[in-house]
Amino acid sequence: FRVGGFAGRVIERMGGVPQNIPGGEIYQALEKGTIDAAEWIGPYDDQKLGFNKVAPVYHYPGWWEGGPQLDFFINDKAFNALSAENKVIVECAAAFAHTEMQAMYDARNPTALKQLVGAKTKVLPFPQDVLDLAFKESMALYEEISTKNPNWKKVYDDYAAFRRDQNLWFRFTEMRFDQFMQSKKL
């Protein structure tokens, strides 16, 4: 399974064998059977690269990445050396790039998904037991790292508290609205 980072560590805990293969080599690895599956970006990019021609089953949701998060990294010393005006310019440019990229994928992924289905790609949900095991092993990994790395623990504890609050809020807003809209024929 081509996946890297934390997701690869979770796959390993689940009994899989993660492979860290560069994006440009995924198609060939799937075609040759070097790997059985690959995590990449989403329908738009997956279809553009033709992955469905060599891996005709498309599983969702991507439990390793509930949604995209585009990051911008800058050296702290370099950023702090900027004028107040230039700091705002960098912050605004980063925010704009994130919003623009998110909007682009939100616009292109539905069409690409339809085209994948039209090309006879089987789009299937991960079985619930797989999602549950991935969640369990993810949480165990985060706790394991927390016991070994105080910096991680500090950041993770803050993140986990924020996530709990967000999950509560989303149950009343986003999730209920999404469920409602998905139940309607548009």
Question: Where do the model's predicted regions map?
Answer:
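N-terminal secretory/targeting leader peptides
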Residues: 1-186
